[in-house]
Swiss-Prot record:
Subcellular location: Cytoplasm
Alphabetic keyword roster: Cytoplasm, Methyltransferase, rRNA processing, S-adenosyl-L-methionine, Transferase
The UniProt record lists the keyword rRNA processing: yes
Matching SUPFAM superfamilies: S-adenosyl-L-methionine-dependent methyltransferases
Family: Belongs to the methyltransferase superfamily. RsmJ family.
EC number: 2.1.1.242
Name under which the protein is recorded: Ribosomal RNA small subunit methyltransferase J
Disulfide bonds: none
GO cellular component, one term: cytoplasm
Chief place where the protein resides: cytoplasm
Gene Ontology MF: a single term: rRNA (guanine-N2-)-methyltransferase activity
HAMAP family (alphabetical): 16SrRNA_methyltr_J
Length: 248
């Protein structure tokens, strides 16, 4: 049961608390509220940080879908997207769903796993609104589905084996940019670092049919100390690729 502050007279929030096993508590560090029909998370003692929400329809995520480089971008190469190969993906650390959305917008079917109940609630709300959108709703319903649960368990319990398992464990950020500061300060105080992240690699390798992709900051060590088959490097991050079979 995770404590959260909510408005007492909003039945939608009461329902969300029941669904995600959240405990309404007026002394909680975080609050959930609806702002213009968008479920929003706020850190109550730092109101200047603003709210965190999931929005696939507008803003930076939508801009990346339209102008982000398509199948030429690093994440697409990392999961093996190419002509004649559109892999199925399990995102074992879904977070706010941005990377999963990029892959879905390029044609992949993505199953999202998120273990933190507040993050899962935000993600489900973002998906709810995206499913209703006239432009992206039809393919979003087909390609992005959410599962709430620990990846450590879910990766061993899924019956349908995906081509790719994608992991982006929470890692302490060193950057000082305003966006990273705002989101990561809220997020890291909410969920903390994924201290058990090393335990994800083995079940991910068991589940994936073709490859496991791990997104890491450029300064981070290899997940579980295991050297990847190859790396794809970007300005601040890298994608460590553990190949099991050709994409073909």
């Amino acid at each position: 049961m995770f404590p959260i502050q909510i408005a007492p007279n909003d039945p939608r929030l009461t329902q969300i608390c029941a669904r995600w096993d959240l405990t309404p508590n007026d002394n909680a560090e975080f609050s959930l509220l609806f702002e213009e029909d968008i479920l929003t998370l706020k850190k109550r003692d730092e109101p200047k940080l603003g709210g965190i929400m999931v929005d696939f329809v507008s803003g930076a995520v939508a801009h990346r879908r339209k102008f982000g480089g398509g199948r030429g971008q690093a994440i697409a190469k990392a999961v093996g997207l190419k002509a004649g190969a559109t892999p199925t993906v399990v995102d074992g650390t879904a977070g706010l769903g941005r990377d999963a959305f990029v892959l879905a917008s390029l044609g992949c079917r993505v199953l999202l796993i998120e273990r933190h109940p507040v993050v899962a609630a935000l993600l489900e709300d973002g998906l709810r609104r995206a499913y209703l959108d006239g432009e992206i709703g039809p393919w979003m319903q087909q390609r992005m589905q959410l599962v709430h649960g620990s990846s450590l368990e879910a990766l061993d319990n899924l019956e349908d084996k995906p081509d790719v398992v994608y992991l982006d464990p929470m890692y302490p950020h060193r950057e000082k940019s305003a966006l990273v500061k705002k989101e990561m300060r809220v997020f890291q105080s909410l969920v903390g670092a994924d201290t058990d992240a090393d335990g994800l690699l083995a079940p991910a390798l068991r589940l994936a049919q073709k490859r496991v992709v791990v997104k890491r900051p450029d300064y981070a060590e290899d997940l579980d100390g295991v050297r990847p088959s190859t790396r794809i490097e970007t300005k601040k991050n890298r994608f460590d690729v553990y190949v099991k079979a050709a994409m073909g």
